[in-house]
Amino acid sequence: MLTAIVGTNWGDEGKGRMVDLLSEKYDIVVRYQGGNNAGHTVVNDKGKFILNLLPSGILRDDTVNVLGAGIVIDLEHLFNETARLREGGIAISPANLKISDRATICMPYHKLLDGLEEDRLGDKKFGSTRRGISPVYADKFMKKTLRMGDLKNIDHLRERVAGIVEWKNLTVAGGYGHEPVDVDEIMAWLEKFGKPFADYVCDTTVYLTEAVKDGKSVMFEAQLGALRDIDFGIYPYTSASTTLAAYAPIGSGVPQLKLDESIGIMKAYSSCVGEGPFTCEMFGDEAHALREAGGEYGAATGRPRRVGGFDAVASRYGAQMQGCTAIALTKLDVMSYMDKIPVCVAYELDGKRIENFPGNIEELERAKPVYEYLEGFKCDISACRKPEDLPKAALDYVKYIEKAVGCPIKYISVSAEREGCIEMF
């Protein structure tokens, strides 16, 4: 079985929680795109963990985890993240973590450039996490990056690094007027944070190809959501990578494989980190109440998330882009404080009702939500474990979303713990 776990919205839908829950059915979990610019929060019997780079399967003792070729890796962050998990009792070794030799290294100057550009943009900034993601992907396509396979021979990299640094300083010093990047500092950084992972690096294409031939099941874990995809998201307020399920085999290094299923993760309401149009956004006390009820603060940045009612227009589009065969609806329990639950069923654009998600940023900025309101269920549902345990109003809300999105809802999350998930069929 080859399954992708993907976000249908702006990210932060609860993918890590669902990967942790479902990964017991899989032998291997693969991260295939992005970097440490988003976080997956997992609560299990070992504690609460926030994962930025590592696949969520790392929390299961018998699961092999892979960082695929499409990933960009900040070595310092990976060093600290693995150390933090080990302190929490999680075992990490080359036996359960394999890193593609083709994965790109996110260097310190990528983070520097990310911050310098956000500062230059001022009020026009994109809301970057300043983790260097866009600069490193840009350099990847300029063919001026290092890859994880290069860590096998750090001592022979100096000449190559010097050439890249000379080129980067044309921008860092020449363009932004910042102090130039120092080659010695970069080499020391690679030595300190890169060498510890040299034994983890391998040809993951060979590993995954052989594993699938041997009948192993693989889960592909995405980062962010469909609306952050570089091509089909809310451009330019997107990530720099392809966040779609269709990219999972490619970013994992096994483009010859075909997915069996794509499980789309969406919240029972909307949330968003960063800038850009967010049609269903709530403000003031209304937003504060939902943000506090849902604990809506970024796992990677700690930034308060923008929140709003469920957006059926955006979610339907996201599910289509992800080719979803089923939906996991998360944080249904958060809605229990509402008397009436708002659902955006369409947009009003220049006086006309539309039900398709606009691809043009200017149109999306002008769009206004058209709401319908459903009865709230006004009770604690966190102890529910079967569909029949849910109050009728909660089930009605789930069925309404299922019809609006056009995809069956297979899982419903009603609490943060592993057992707090209801399987609908």
Residue ranges and their predicted role:
Residues 1-425:
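Non-transmembrane, aqueous-exposed alpha-helical and coiled segments at domain scale
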